[in-house]
C-alpha cells in the first residue's frame, strides 16, 4: 500500500483531529472540508496505507493516523503520494512523491495559477469547482471526486421516524437563513403544521457576534422554530433524521455542500437554489432562480411537496437510494484509487 502524506497550509483544516468531529475539543464540530479530510485519512489508514497529516493538530494521538506540526514536514522524506489539502503550500513543490492537490476551496492563500503546474493531479469536489478553476485560473487538468459521507455517524439514527413537515437548516447562516426567514411566514400560513429546526451557527469556526443576531431574527416564530445552533455531532444527527425537508434558498456559490449531501443520505428531501454546485450535489428539487427576487417560487414548490405526502415519501426514498450509492465512502475510496493513486 502506498504511504500518503497530507500537507495543509492555512485556514480551517489547521488543528482539527477526529475528536474535533464530535465536539470533544473546544470546537463545536467542523465544516465539510475538514470532515472529508479526516474521514478519508481514517479510511486510508483502515485500508492499510500509512498516513501522516501535517496540520498542527490541537492534540497529538487524537486520531487513528499520525498527525504532526506543519514544521515537521520534510520535503525529502520518502513517500509515495503527497496531497496538498485545500490551499497551495510551497513546501511541497520540490518534495518527493507524486504531487496531488486536493482543493476544497476557490479562494485561499497562495497563487493557484502558478502552483498548478507543479502538481501531477488536481482533485476538485464538484464540476462547478473544476469549471471555476478553468475559467478563473486557467487550470484545465482538474478532475472531480465527490466528498464522502461519514457513514458510521448515521448508524444509530437509521430507524428514526421523521416529523411530518419538519424543515431543517444545517448550513452556514449567511448562505440562506435570511432568505428562509423571508418565506417562512407564507409557509406557516399555507402549511399550519410546519416546523423548523436550525442546527448551525458560527461556533463551528469559533465565537462570532453574528450568532445572536440570527437567533433574534427568529424570535417571533419560536412556537414553531427551534434555533438550536451548532450541535454536537450526535445531536445534529438526531435532528437531521427527524426532518422531512431541507428548504435551502442558498445565495452562496457552494463548491459541494456537505449539508445537502448529509440530508439526502438521511432521507431528508432538499429544495434548494441552483447556486454553485447545488445543481449537481442536490438530487432533489432545484429551483433555478435567485431566492432574493423569486420568493414565490420557493414558497409554491415547498407547499406543493408538503401537500402531497405520498409523493414526498416516494421522492425521499428514490433520492436516498441515489445518495447512498453516490456519496458512499467505498465508492469514493475506489475513485481515489483509480484516478489518483494509480
Model regions and ranges:
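Acidic anion/phosphate-binding donor-loop and adjacent secondary structure
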Residues: 110-111, 134-135, 143-164
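A charged, aromatic-enriched C-terminal amphipathic alpha-helix characteristic of glycosyltransferases
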Residues: 35, 39, 293, 307-341
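Acidic donor-binding loop of glycosyltransferase active sites
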Residues: 241-255
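Nucleotide-activated donor-binding/catalytic signature segment of Leloir-type glycosyltransferases, i.e.
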Residues: 210-237
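Conserved donor-binding/catalytic core segment of Leloir-type glycosyltransferases
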Residues: 158-176, 181, 197
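Short hydrophobic beta-strand element within catalytic cores of glycosyltransferases
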Residues: 269-272
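Extended catalytic core of nucleotide-activated donor transferases of GT-like folds
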Residues: 52-120, 124-131
Amino acid at each position: 500500500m502506498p504511504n500518503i502524506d497530507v500537507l495543509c497550509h492555512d485556514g480551517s483544516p489547521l488543528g482539527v483531529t477526529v475528536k474535533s468531529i464530535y465536539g470533544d475539543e473546544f470546537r463545536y464540530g467542523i465544516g465539510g472540508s475538514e470532515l472529508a479530510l479526516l474521514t478519508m485519512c481514517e479510511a486510508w489508514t483502515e485500508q492499510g496505507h500509512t498516513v501522516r497529516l501535517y496540520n498542527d493538530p490541537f492534540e497529538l494521538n487524537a486520531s487513528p493516523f499520525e498527525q504532526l506540526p506543519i514544521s515537521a514536514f520534510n520535503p525529502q522524506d520518502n513517500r509515495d503520494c503527497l496531497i496538498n489539502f485545500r490551499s497551495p503550500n510551497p513546501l511541497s513543490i520540490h518534495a518527493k512523491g507524486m504531487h496531488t492537490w486536493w482543493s476544497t476551496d476557490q479562494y485561499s492563500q497562495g497563487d493557484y495559477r502558478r502552483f498548478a503546474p507543479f502538481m501531477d493531479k488536481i482533485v476538485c469536489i464538484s464540476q462547478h469547482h473544476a469549471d471555476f478553476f478553468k475559467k478563473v485560473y486557467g487550470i484545465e487538468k482538474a478532475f472531480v471526486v465527490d466528498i464522502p459521507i461519514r457513514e458510521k455517524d448515521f448508524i444509530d439514527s437509521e430507524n428514526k421516524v421523521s416529523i411530518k413537515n419538519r424543515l431543517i437548516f444545517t448550513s452556514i447562516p449567511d448562505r440562506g437563513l435570511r432568505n428562509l426567514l423571508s418565506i417562512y411566514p407564507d409557509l406557516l400560513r399555507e402549511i399550519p403544521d410546519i416546523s423548523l429546526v436550525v442546527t448551525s451557527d458560527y461556533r463551528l469556526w469559533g465565537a462570532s457576534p453574528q450568532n445572536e443576531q440570527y437567533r433574534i431574527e427568529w424570535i417571533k416564530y419560536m412556537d414553531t422554530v427551534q434555533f438550536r445552533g451548532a450541535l454536537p455531532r450526535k445531536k445534529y444527527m438526531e435532528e437531521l433524521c427527524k426532518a422531512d425537508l431541507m428548504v435551502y434558498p442558498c445565495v452562496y456559490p457552494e463548491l459541494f455542500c456537505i449539508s445537502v449531501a448529509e440530508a439526502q443520505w438521511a432521507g431528508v428531501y432538499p429544495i434548494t437554489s441552483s447556486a454553485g454546485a447545488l445543481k449537481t450535489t442536490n438530487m432533489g428539487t432545484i429551483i433555478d432562480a435567485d431566492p432574493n427576487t423569486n420568493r414565490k417560487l420557493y414558497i409554491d414548490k415547498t407547499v406543493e411537496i408538503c401537500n402531497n405526502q405520498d409523493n414526498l415519501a416516494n421522492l425521499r426514498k428514490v433520492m436516498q437510494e441515489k445518495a447512498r450509492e453516490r456519496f458512499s465512502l467505498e465508492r469514493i475510496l475506489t475513485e481515489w484509487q483509480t484516478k489518483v493513486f494509480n
